[in-house]
Amino acid sequence: QARDLLGLLLLRWDAYNLKTVLRGKRAHAPTEEVLASTLPVGWLDEVALAELTQVTTLRATADTLETWRSPLARPFREGLRAVGESGDLQFLEFALDRFAFAQALRAVAEDGDNDCVVRDYLRLLVDKANFLTALRYLYERSALSPVEAGRHFLEANGRFTRAHYDAVAGARDVRHAMALLADTPIRRLAGTFP
């Protein structure tokens, strides 16, 4: 079980590395620079990531992941459908994150000591991802409607709730968002904004 759990935790890094490669390719960054920004500790090793930097399209990337039987192939394909004509990678990135976190949280549904520690850690990571996503929507008001932004909330029963997420995404500005969070579990962060 420990090996399976470790593999699921490393799946998050595979998702991170895949998103890094996609962003690097989108920015036309040199391959060496893209690879230097990855942490190949999971299923996608250095060789696989280097190969993905050479794949020319998102569809070809999906095909490559499927050929390799990567666990990220299915969520990548689903995210790719959401990208559609817009070419906006956020839908694809969200599908990868949702899958990686959901798989790991499902694996730690037990009540053992190790599972509790890992579950709390995963919830912290999901809270962080939700907080940063809400801030992005606050910053990029025109990017998505509140309903669309709400679809990107990752469920993990963490301390940063859907109500917190909606409050931040709908705030007037960052200071207002932090003021709304003053009586929440992330009040220390909220207190850094005067």
Describe the residue ranges of each PLM region.
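Extended alpha-helical surfaces
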Residues: 1-194
